[in-house]
């Protein structure tokens, strides 16, 4: 039985194959599942064994983005709009019922890639746009979507397609992103399995972070970001990237900044603040050899930075690694990669999974 009804912002959306259970507000709460690291969801199990899932707006906390009433049930088909949803689906052994994904051309996971190539999983996007006809044609029982696009989602809900808004990518910590598997665990009726997966990730991540605390003597300075149109875009100090750098034993140059979005600076400020940083980190999407011109995006001024001169540039190439997929459940591997960059004495024989030094 598919039962989903959601309060999204200021309006109510209903989607159900069978009528939703009534009077949920009058049901007692048996237990509350509060994430340890994630800030974007809270789950309550009610006295009738259904769940009330509250999804929070991570860009406007503590506002509620969506509230779902969920009954444990057998799902026959699911879909997702982001490649970052796929690792959660795979880890909980739900790939056999996956019928569609967004941005299928960017999928790197070999098992999902093979399903797409065989025509078993449809591409639900055209360019950067949602293909509504494909969604209706696929008609999944449940679809994991981005935390925006309310008008389209209302149409899907009216057609009986349950929509759950997933915003793991807005979490400010690596473990916060990974902990969203616990939400998927409730939806797939695999709560214990999801908790076990997350606890293993948490233990591995914290073990790596503790190695830095006990072994690293110094913390090299680090900057990151990209240059576009005369401005430098960098994550703030309260971000996923900053937390990863700090946990790896680096000192992020803007660690004290607090912002709900990227920091945007003119190049002249970066020239002052980051010119002498020990390391420069980047997320890139490049096929083929990474040249100095590609790395600096054609701006020769960057070649004068200390990090460039000493070849202390590290990067993750999203064209060659599953950074926009499996990495969400492998923060411990990303952390290990960065530790090997900043403190090679700790990981002397390290094989990078995501981040590596520019050679």
Where do the protein language model's features map onto the residues?
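A ligand-binding cleft/hinge motif common to bilobed small-molecule-binding domains
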Residues: 148-158, 284-296
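Extracytoplasmic substrate-binding proteins
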Residues: 120, 131, 137-231, 255-256, ...
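A short, structured surface patch at a secondary-structure boundary
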Residues: 54-63, 70-148
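Bacterial Sec-exported substrate-binding components of ABC uptake systems
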Residues: 16-86, 193-223, 289, 296, ...
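Short, structured coil segments at secondary-structure junctions
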Residues: 94, 159-161, 248-249, 309
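Flexible, glycine-rich surface segments
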Residues: 208-293
